[in-house]
C-alpha cells in the first residue's frame, strides 16, 4: 500500500471536516493517524511474530472514523472507505479493511466471532480517548460548549468520567491494552488533581 497517497485521501475526506460541533476541525483525521500508529504498537507487543496484517491495520486505523457523524458511523464508514479506496487497494485488502471498519465500534471482548485484528483496532481506538488526548478532548469540548471557567472540569472527572472508567476498561480485549489504559487513567487523574488545586489558587 502507498501510505503517502492513502494519507492524502484521508486528509481530503476528513482533514477539514467537523464531525461534531464540539470537536475541532480535522479531529477524525488526526485521531485516525494516531490510531494507525498505536494499533501497530499493540500488534507488535501482543502478537510480535505476526506482521501479516500490518498494512491492513494501518489503513483501517487511518480510515476507521471516516463515517463519523453519520450513524451508525462504523457501517457507514465501511461504505465510504470502500469507495475512497477502491483504486488503491486490491479486492482482498479492501474487504479486510472495510470489515475492520464496519465493526470497530462493536465491542464484545468475550465474543470470539471477531478476529484478533479487529480487536486490536478496537483497543487502539478506545485508548486514544484517554491520557493526553483525553485531557485535550475534555478541554476542547468545554470550550466549544461555552464553559468559561476551568473549575467546572474537576466536577466532570469526579462524576461522569469516573463512572465511565470501569465500563470502558471492560470493553478492552487484551491485558496489554488494559495496562496502557490504567496508566493513561492515572495520568489524567493526576493532571486533574493538579488542575483542581491551581484553579482554586493553590500550588501545593
Task: Name every feature range the model reports, one short phrase each.
Residues 1-18:
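Short alpha-helical hairpin
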Residues 35-36, 73-87:
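An active-site-proximal "capping" alpha-helix that borders the catalytic cofactor pocket
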Residues 18-21, 43, 65-67, 85, ...:
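Short amphipathic alpha-helical interaction patches enriched in hydrophobic/aromatic residues
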Residues 90-95:
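Membrane-interface starts of transmembrane alpha-helices
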Residues 52-73, 77, 97-107:
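His-Asp-centered metal-binding catalytic motifs of divalent-metal-dependent phosphohydrolases/nucleases
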Residues 5, 20-49, 89, 110-204:
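Divalent metal-dependent phosphate-bond-processing catalytic cores, especially two-metal-ion Mg2+/Mn2+ enzymes
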Residues 11, 15, 37-40, 44, ...:
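Amphipathic, well-packed alpha-helical segments that form the structural scaffold of globular domains
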Residues 25, 67-71, 87:
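Short gly/ser-rich anion-binding loops that grip negatively charged ligand groups
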